[in-house]
C-alpha cells in the first residue's frame, strides 16, 4: 500500500472509533465520495443493516443532469437520503464523514440532510 492509502485508512479507522464511542445506539450516516459520484447511507450498526441509501447514480439523479462530482448533486443526494430515512422512522443519526474533510461536497450533503429532517 502506498503511504497515502495507509494514512487515509488510519484516519478512517480513527473517525469510526470515535463515532462508535459517541453513537449511543443511533444509526450512522456514512458518506463515500469518488471522483465522479457520491454515495450516502444510514446504517444501523447494532443490527448490521442499511436503513436508507441514496447516491448520484440513481435514475432520479441522472434525469436532473447532475453528475455526482459537484456540490449540487451532493445536496440532492443529502435531501433524498434524509427523506428516505425520515420515512423509515430515523430522525437522529451520527455523521460519519469517513475520513474526508468536512468541506465541499461532504458539507453540502450534510447541510441538505439537516435541512430535510435529520439531526446530528
Swiss-Prot record:
<dbReference type="GO" id="GO:0006412">
    <property type="term" value="P:translation"/>
</dbReference>
<dbReference type="InterPro" id="IPR005484">
    <property type="entry name" value="Ribosomal_uL18_bac/euk"/>
</dbReference>
<dbReference type="InterPro" id="IPR004389">
    <property type="entry name" value="Ribosomal_uL18_bac-type"/>
</dbReference>
<comment type="subunit">
    <text>Part of the 50S ribosomal subunit; part of the 5S rRNA/L5/L18/L25 subcomplex. Contacts the 5S and 23S rRNAs.</text>
</comment>
<dbReference type="GO" id="GO:0022625">
    <property type="term" value="C:cytosolic large ribosomal subunit"/>
</dbReference>
<keyword id="KW-0694">RNA-binding</keyword>
<keyword id="KW-0689">Ribosomal protein</keyword>
<comment type="similarity">
    <text>Belongs to the universal ribosomal protein uL18 family.</text>
</comment>
<protein>
    <recommendedName>
        <fullName>Large ribosomal subunit protein uL18</fullName>
    </recommendedName>
</protein>
<dbReference type="GO" id="GO:0008097">
    <property type="term" value="F:5S rRNA binding"/>
</dbReference>
<comment type="function">
    <text>This is one of the proteins that bind and probably mediate the attachment of the 5S RNA into the large ribosomal subunit, where it forms part of the central protuberance.</text>
</comment>
<dbReference type="GO" id="GO:0003735">
    <property type="term" value="F:structural constituent of ribosome"/>
</dbReference>
<keyword id="KW-0687">Ribonucleoprotein</keyword>
<keyword id="KW-0699">rRNA-binding</keyword>
<dbReference type="Pfam" id="PF00861">
    <property type="entry name" value="Ribosomal_L18p"/>
</dbReference>
Amino acid at each position: 500500500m502506498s503511504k497515502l492509502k495507509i494514512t487515509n485508512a488510519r484516519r478512517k479507522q480513527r473517525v469510526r472509533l470515535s463515532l462508535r464511542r459517541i453513537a449511543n445506539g443511533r444509526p450512522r450516516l456514512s458518506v463515500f465520495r469518488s471522483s465522479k459520484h457520491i454515495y450516502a447511507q444510514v446504517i444501523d450498526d447494532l443490527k448490521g443493516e442499511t436503513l436508507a441509501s441514496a447516491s448520484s447514480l440513481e435514475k432520479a439523479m441522472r434525469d436532473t443532469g447532475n453528475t455526482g462530482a459537484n456540490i449540487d448533486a451532493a445536496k440532492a443526494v443529502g435531501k433524498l437520503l434524509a427523506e428516505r430515512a425520515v420515512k423509515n422512522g430515523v430522525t437522529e443519526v451520527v455523521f460519519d464523514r469517513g475520513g474526508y474533510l468536512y468541506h465541499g461536497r461532504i458539507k453540502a450533503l450534510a447541510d441538505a440532510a439537516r435541512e430535510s429532517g435529520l439531526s446530528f
